[in-house]
UniProtKB/Swiss-Prot annotation:
Keyword Oxidoreductase attached: no
Organism: Sulfolobus acidocaldarius (strain ATCC 33909 / DSM 639 / JCM 8929 / NBRC 15157 / NCIMB 11770)
InterPro entries, sorted: aa-tRNA-synt_IIb, aa-tRNA-synth_II, aa-tRNA-synth_II/BPL/LPL, Anticodon-bd, Anticodon-bd_dom_sf, Pro-tRNA-ligase_IIa, Pro-tRNA-ligase_IIa_arc-type, Pro-tRNA_ligase_II_C
Catalyzed reactions per annotation: tRNA(Pro) + L-proline + ATP = L-prolyl-tRNA(Pro) + AMP + diphosphate
PROSITE patterns tied to this protein: AA_TRNA_LIGASE_II (PS50862)
Domain of life: Archaea
Subcellular location: Cytoplasm
GO biological process, one term: prolyl-tRNA aminoacylation
UniProt protein name: Proline--tRNA ligase
GO annotation, cellular component aspect: aminoacyl-tRNA synthetase multienzyme complex; cytoplasm
GO MF assignments: ATP binding; proline-tRNA ligase activity
Known partners and oligomeric status: Homodimer.
Length: 483
């Protein structure tokens, strides 16, 4: 069966809304507050698998989970001036308690650098207590004024993993940035999500950071989505809160910090990146259900009962071997109707069991990504399912990476860059001298967003000149249409 991706690529926004609704992943647009949605049971399980994975990776590197209050006093938020300027217009403020006006406005947490640094002034006094590595998985709130989109641009980001670390020296914090990058690389690799890493330009780094490294991916409509960030904060926040620690030589100094975050966007990408016109295709790493069994009724009622019993036995074997499996016993739907809904949901494997399979002591297994099937004897069931799931995982990952690579272009002509971006090129790289003035000019001329310069594996531009000033290029600047 030939699988098409026309809706997926050419009308992605509609496709995405259709999938999250019909697959019962996320209910968006009906809750009576703009920019806030509801995780439905199936979607919540997908979300939980991602949360469990990031917890495992952070815990393995010595991070400790905490849980801070939702409300942040205004004076705390304003303590680091550059930080609050970066998103003051996006803050939700609580101004009343019951009928009483509050003396100090309270912000619904937009991020937690200020709150955590404030508490660390009580917790940390000596280098012997360092490094500190905290993280929490919470809701954060931003008053988005642009058009909101489910999971992608929200006013309540309900799956915000933020890590915050404290270090004696700049170099220690620098090493932590590299560790955070490796954690995220492992996270995205495990989920099969392709990415590029860029150092954000000075004018677009995190407010209060020395520098920001961002992970971006390309969505089916060729727009770029930021899926993770890592910030070296230096001493900006520790100085603002007068947080000093005793160093090894007995002197007092301000420690250095990092922070790094990911959000619901990871789930949006996982649902989208390998989809087709039949629905989403979930990696076995995230799929709450690894296999769905569809019993095919026989003409004879007694034989149909035997098919159901046989299906239950097959499910029991798989579940007992750690492969989460369900049987669709809905008698109101035809097998074809069942195929339709489980394909939308992206369940990796479909197991069809009818009279033929019953008589031959076998099952017929179809992969969701290809809809190609094979007949498997019952005694080989577990080994074949394990093999198919692993092959499917690898194939999905390879396909996603191939899609991303096909969407990265290079040109040394600014007008050509604009044309490429207008024709859904994805990411376009141009030679750049690294000056802010030229970078802003490139952004203005193309009407695109500057992602920054490559963090790793940069192109050789030693013989190129900046597309604006024509001075020798030092690196490339990445441009894209973004969300």
């Amino acid at each position: 069966m030939k699988l098409t991706r026309e809706k997926w690529e050419n009308n992605f926004s509609e496709w995405f809304d259709w999938v999250i609704r019909e697959a019962e992943i996320y209910d968006y647009g009906r809750y009576p507050v703009k920019g806030m949605g509801v995780w439905l049971p199936y979607g919540f399980k997908i979300r939980q698998a991602a949360v469990d994975l990031i917890r495992k990776l952070l815990d393995a590197k010595g991070h400790e989970e905490v849980l801070f209050p939702l409300l942040v006093p205004e004076d705390l938020l304003r303590r680091e001036g550059e930080h609050i300027k970066g998103f003051e217009s996006e803050v939700f403020w609580v101004t009343k308690g019951g009928e009483e006006n509050l003396d100090i406005r309270l912000a619904l947490r937009p991020t937690s650098e200020t709150a955590i640094t404030y508490m660390e002034t009580y917790w940390v006094q000596s280098y012997k207590q360092l490094p500190k590595k905290y993280y929490q998985i919470v809701s954060v709130f931003r008053y988005e004024t642009k058009a909101t989109r489910p999971m992608i641009r929200l006013r309540e980001v309900s799956t915000f993993k933020e890590a915050h670390t404290l270090h004696e020296t700049y170099e220690d914090a620098e090493r932590q940035v590299k560790e955070a990058i490796e954690i995220y690389k492992n996270f995205f690799e495990e989920l099969g999500i392709p990415y590029i890493m860029s150092q954000r330009p000075e004018w677009d780094k995190f407010a209060g950071a020395i520098y920001t490294i961002a992970f971006d991916t390309i969505m089916p409509d060729s727009r770029v989505l930021q899926i993770g960030t890592v910030h070296h904060l230096g001493q900006h926040f520790t100085k603002a809160f007068d947080l000093k620690v005793q160093r090894k030589d007995g002197t007092l100094d301000y420690p250095h910090q990092t922070s790094y975050g990911i959000s619901d966007r990871v789930i949006a990408v996982a649902v989208s990146i390998n989809g087709d016109d039949h629905g989403t295709i979930l990696s076995p790493v995230l799929a709450p259900i690894k296999a769905v069994i569809i019993p095919i009724p026989a003409k004879d009622e007694k034989e149909t009962e035997k098919i159901i019993e046989y299906s239950e036995d097959v499910a029991k074997i798989l579940v007992s071997n750690g492969i989460n499996t369900v049987i669709d016993k809905d008698t109101e739907k035809t097998p074809g109707e069942k195929y339709y809904i489980w394909e939308i949901k992206g369940v990796p494997l479909r197991i069809e069991i009818g009279p033929r399979e019953l008589s031959s002591n076998s099952v017929f297994i179809k992969r969701r990504d290809t809809l190609q099937g094979i007949s498997v004897k019952k005694e080989n069931l577990v080994s074949e399912v394990v093999k198919l799931l692993e092959t499917l995982r690898k194939d999905l990952k390879e396909r996603a990476w191939n899609f991303l690579r096909s969407k990265i272009r290079y040109t040394d002509n600014l007008e050509e860059a604009k044309k490429m971006l207008d024709s859904k090129a994805g990411i376009v790289e141009v030679p750049w001298c690294e000056s802010n003035e030229c970078g802003l000019k490139i952004e203005e001329t193309t009407g695109a967003r500057v992602l920054g310069k490559p963090y790793d594996s940069p192109r050789d531009v030693s013989k190129s000149t900046c597309v604006v000033c024509k001075k020798p290029a030092k690196t490339t600047l990445r441009l894209a249409k973004t969300y």
